């Protein structure tokens, strides 16, 4: 391992020990904000510290085994060779883990997020599939112990949704779900298809980090056009007799957000503003990323909703991720919220790309 990496790890261990000491300080314990911030830092440093300590132990084990290999006793030498082999394997494995733990973290990864699903091409079937995707993500959130709250929904006439925006609250929600952004295509026989022909429909998914109040962009009232209207359900029937639904247009960017799920206009406006802020920040981040992007692929997508990332093929029972050429034949499990088998390989590929980029710049 490079000396520069070892130095960085030693610095992190020193900070870990310092934070550990601070958490026992009565002044810190009495300051809830400071205690909370240090507790979060402690948990972030703990994993890399434990891994580095295991790496150092493996180095010590190797040195001890190499000394044992110099013994006159043949049985001891054979035992030493086994220990040398085990120690070298542990050192290699732990060095790889440490490199991943040292990769630059997205500051948004620990945040809650907004999940936006829109029906695309495919008519009624696209709306039904949007509903299926929302159910899939809801099941996944439940498995993770996350909370999911509908922010805004526009129901389709024959089931599902034209558009659905939900807030996902839980540890690391954005960091996990951000790889779901892009185009999702479904191939199946619709319930209304009498000839048994397979139809192709599509939905788009956008995942945006929730922005903490302290980091919210300044949105001037003069830059907003706010319309109120009556909330309506599928088929246009009115579900509310007051103008509680809100449509907010951010004039400088043309960003439009609607919210009609609450009976209170005030609550709908608050929800719409939260989504609007997330969209504005996301658009700015995508613009900056585009300015500095190179030829390296980006598994997070270009931000273009038309980027097709996944196909769900019902006749064959398969799901394919086009970014990493992965196909699994577990469609039913995936639609029941078992997404980890799809998410983990994408995260691993993303980390491999980050490591390759670091190696190029080293």
Swiss-Prot record:
Keyword Protein biosynthesis on entry: yes
Residues with N5-methylglutamine modification: 237
Keyword tags: Cytoplasm, Methylation, Protein biosynthesis
SUPFAM superfamilies: Release factor
Intracellular or extracellular location(s): Cytoplasm
GO cellular component terms attached to this protein's record: cytoplasm
PANTHER family reported for this sequence: LD18447P
Stated name of the protein: Peptide chain release factor 1
């Amino acid at each position: 391992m490079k000396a520069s990496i070892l130095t960085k790890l030693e610095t992190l261990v020193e900070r870990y020990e310092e934070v550990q000491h601070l958490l026992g300080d009565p002044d810190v314990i009495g300051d809830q904000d400071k205690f909370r911030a240090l507790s979060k830092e402690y948990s972030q440093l703990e994993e890399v510290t434990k891994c580095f300590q295991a790496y150092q132990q493996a180095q010590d084990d190797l040195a001890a085994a190499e000394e044992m290999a110099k013994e006159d006793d043949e049985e001891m030498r054979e035992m030493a060779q086994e220990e040398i082999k085990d120690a070298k394997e542990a050192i290699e494995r732990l060095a790889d883990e440490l490199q991943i733990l040292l990769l630059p973290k997205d500051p948004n990864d620990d945040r809650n997020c907004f999940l936006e699903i829109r029906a695309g091409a495919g008519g009624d079937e696209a709306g039904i599939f949007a509903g299926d995707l929302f159910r899939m993500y809801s099941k996944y959130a439940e498995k993770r112990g996350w909370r999911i709250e509908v922010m805004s929904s526009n129901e389709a006439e024959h089931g599902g949704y034209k558009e659905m925006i939900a807030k996902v609250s839980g540890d690391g929600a954005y960091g996990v779900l951000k790889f779901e952004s892009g185009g999702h295509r479904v191939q199946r026989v619709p319930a209304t298809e009498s000839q048994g022909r397979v139809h192709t429909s599509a939905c788009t998914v956008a995942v945006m980090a929730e922005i903490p109040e302290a980091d919210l962009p300044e949105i001037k009232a003069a830059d907003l056009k706010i319309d109120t209207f009556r909330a309506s359900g599928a088929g246009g029937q009115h579900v509310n007799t007051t103008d509680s639904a809100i449509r907010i247009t951010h004039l400088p960017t043309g960003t439009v957000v609607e919210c009609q799920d609450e009976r209170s206009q005030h609550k709908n406006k608050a929800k719409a503003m939260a989504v609007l802020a997330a969209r504005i920040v996301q658009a700015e981040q995508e613009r900056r990323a585009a300015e500095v992007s190179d030829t390296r692929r980006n598994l997070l997508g270009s931000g273009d909703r038309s980027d097709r990332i996944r196909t769900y093929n019902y006749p064959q029972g398969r799901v394919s991720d086009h970014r990493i050429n992965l196909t699994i034949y577990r469609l039913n499990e995936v639609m029941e919220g078992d997404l980890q088998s799809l998410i983990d390989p994408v995260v691993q590929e993303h980390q491999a790309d980050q490591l390759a980029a670091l190696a190029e710049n080293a």
